[in-house]
A protein has these predicted regions:
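Hydrophobic alpha-helix-in-membranes signature
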Residues: 20, 73, 78, 136-137
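Active-site nucleotide/adenylate-binding loops and adjacent lid/helix of ATP-dependent enzymes
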Residues: 32-120
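Conserved N-proximal alpha/beta basic substrate-recognition cap immediately N-terminal to
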Residues: 1-52, 57
Length: 186
């Protein structure tokens, strides 16, 4: 179930209260990862490199100059809650900032203004049983679009390459740096 209540921890909480087993992450992991700002702050505590960002709350404003000064261009402006890249804009010029903020506030009451980080996009899944934790090899995400937007995610505008085309050393580092701290804490 996409969005609320399936991805934000509510459904898991209901199942926990009724003692119904389920096969996805628990309440805490879902709640933290559904909120991009909270998730970023949480991961920073484990030394994970996170893009510089600003959080705007409904009714709060920011000037174009302040965005450029504090975050730089290009940047991403997106709702802090939610998924599927709804309300996300890759902003390249000052003139795009305010319309992108309005668009993001159309999806949520908090908006994240986040610096663009250039590089190879990776994702890495894992699951835990009573006996062990299994970590999958990193997958490289190569979008055909400007960024990994809704169209790329749901309409086949992406290549997902497993294992990722990165060095063995970088593969080991990514597994340690990303999967280890987060899997034990979430």
């Amino acid at each position: 179930i996409h969005g609320t209540p399936g991805e934000d921890g509510r459904l898991q909480g209901y199942f926990d209260m009724m003692r119904i087993p389920y096969s996805c992450c628990g309440v805490l992991a879902a709640a933290i990862t559904y909120d991009k700002f909270t998730c970023n702050q949480y991961l920073k505590a484990f030394g994970v490199r996170i893009a510089e960002s600003l959080l705007l709350r409904q009714g709060q404003s920011i000037s174009d100059e302040e965005v450029v000064e504090k975050i730089g261009l290009p940047c991403f402006i997106k709702p802090s809650l939610g998924g599927s890249s709804f309300g996300v804009t890759k902003v390249k010029t000052k003139e795009q900032i305010q319309p992108a903020i309005v668009k993001a506030f159309g999806e949520a009451q908090e908006v994240l203004v986040e610096a663009f980080m250039d590089g190879t996009e990776l994702t890495c899944g894992c699951y835990k049983t009573k006996e062990k934790t299994v970590i999958f090899p990193p997958t490289e995400v190569v979008t055909h679009n400007e960024f990994f937007d809704y169209d790329a995610k749901y309409n086949g505008q992406v290549d997902e390459i497993t294992p990722a085309r990165i060095s063995d050393e970088l593969t080991k580092l990514s597994l340690i740096h990303i999967s280890e701290p987060t899997r034990h804490s979430l």
